[in-house]
Amino acid sequence: LSLVLMVVPLVSLIFGTIHFYNSYEFIELLASQPLKRRTILLAEFMGVSIALCSAFLLGVGVPVLLYAANATGLTLLCVGLMLTVIFIALAFLGAVATRDKARGIGVAMLMWFYFALLHGGVMLFVMFTFEDYPLEKATMAMISLNPIDLGRVVVLLQMDVSALMGFTGALMKDLLGSALGAACGIGVLTLW
């Protein structure tokens, strides 16, 4: 679980950013042809997404299907695939926003640092600072703003170890513990 939640977003961000910058001249050539820019970017995005999702399915999917072909394993695969696509989209967003390759890779690494590490610290700070107030809805909103945390919550609730997650786990078990709640979590990941 930790490998999927930490490494998959990092690889997706870095690979997506580097691919975009390395194929920048080819994209410019295609843009000079009578093709819509939306079509060009969507084709680039789909190509990178299919390649990285295939690599994820080969590297993680085969062992999970061999040794843990249950609901938890399939949820882990689904979350991993969604995180791959989400972070490739974020990589393309960062690469389109900056023309300099070094700055674009830096933006991608900062995005990963925020989503993987900093967001959890900000959540803890807010929860400890405002512990006297009801934070259920605010916690749900903050978790929805981070696809890595949302994926972690969906997989851990499927594993039924929410007692190990403390206050957040109890809250998530109440709000997302049912099949409808898990579907809402997957739906928010899809919106990402």
Regions found by a protein language model. Give the residues of each.
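Short alpha-helical transmembrane interface motifs in multi-pass membrane proteins
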Residues: V8-L13, L42-A43, A71-L76, L180-C184
